[in-house]
Amino acid sequence: AKAFARVEKAKRPVPASYGKDDQDWKRMLERKDLDIVFVVTPWELHAPMGVATMLAGKHVFIEVPIALTVEENWQLVDTAEKTQRHCMMLENTCYGREELLCLNLCRLGVLGELLHAEGAYIHELRSQMNNVEHGTGSWRTPHYAKRNGNLYPTHGIGPVAQYLGINRGDRFDYLSSVSSPARGRELYAKAKFPANHRWNTELTSWVGGDINTSIIKTVRGRSLMMQWDETSPRPYSRLNLIQGTKGTFASYPGRLVIEGETKSTHAWTEGATLETLFKKYEHPLWKKIGDLATANGGHGGMDFIMLWRVITCLRQG
């Protein structure tokens, strides 16, 4: 309803709707006038919808996480190769201003040899549990209760994997992953909902730890630390740290040290001084459309840039 209201407000033609039942989306794939499909649905539908879209001859762009199992990931890869259709995971955090700056710093060699990175998705989202019948919490909450690990890794690992050139000269080798006890969401359910509510009757044994920490080693010997926490009462952060032999950048808040360029290696460069370095090392993509992206919104402009890049790449073949 919200999407249709936006279309009407913009005075654009009302699009076709496919929502008669939970299989009606397959009817949409039968259309001959569709080139690309965006999959923005509950997690468990991402991979099946992606595979079906490519088999129908369309390119597919899938929200994170792109799949829930190793088998589903291989299904997407095999289908993309078989059908020669594009299959892209829509990781918007790779297109934020700070993330693009970091990528440029790394590619220009400003930070020296890259040694270590940190990423995370720390976002207190317990209130989503109030979406019981419809909405994000209605389908995400059971995942938290029944699965343990980092269920949403790519917001943190996506950008730093780009910095390190993962699968472009290096690759992940092995990892060690641990989770804390599962406490926060069970306590929230008991405090906010009656005893006979589905969150207190159907989800009686919560296994997903409140915070997960994973240490990854690459083939070239570099290290990464990844965290995920959508439960604990703490401020938002994606960490976004990249460390090299000549400097380090970290986010939340954005701060930078470059040996021989910033004032000291014992203190972060922040604020107005950092903005000067932003101007010097701004990524070409942000220089090109950063103002337009910011004006159009979407997580500070990153959504706009990601979608702009999708369409631009498709148009250029």
Predicted regions span which residues?
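C-terminal helical cap and adjacent loop that interface with cofactors, partners, or active-site loops
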Residues: 161, 211, 232-317
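Active-site beta-strand termini and strand-to-loop segments that position acidic
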Residues: 214-220, 244
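Predominantly a Rossmann-like dinucleotide-binding segment in NAD(P)-dependent oxidoreductases
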Residues: 83-88, 93-205, 239, 248, ...
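Non-transmembrane alpha-helical segments in soluble domains
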Residues: 1-4, 26-29, 51-54, 77, ...
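ADP-ribose/adenylate-binding Rossmann-like module
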Residues: 56-69
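N-terminal glycine-/serine-/threonine-rich beta1-alpha1-beta2 phosphate-ribose binding loop
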Residues: 1-58, 74, 78-86
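Active-site rim elements
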Residues: 143-150, 200-203, 228-229, 290-300, ...
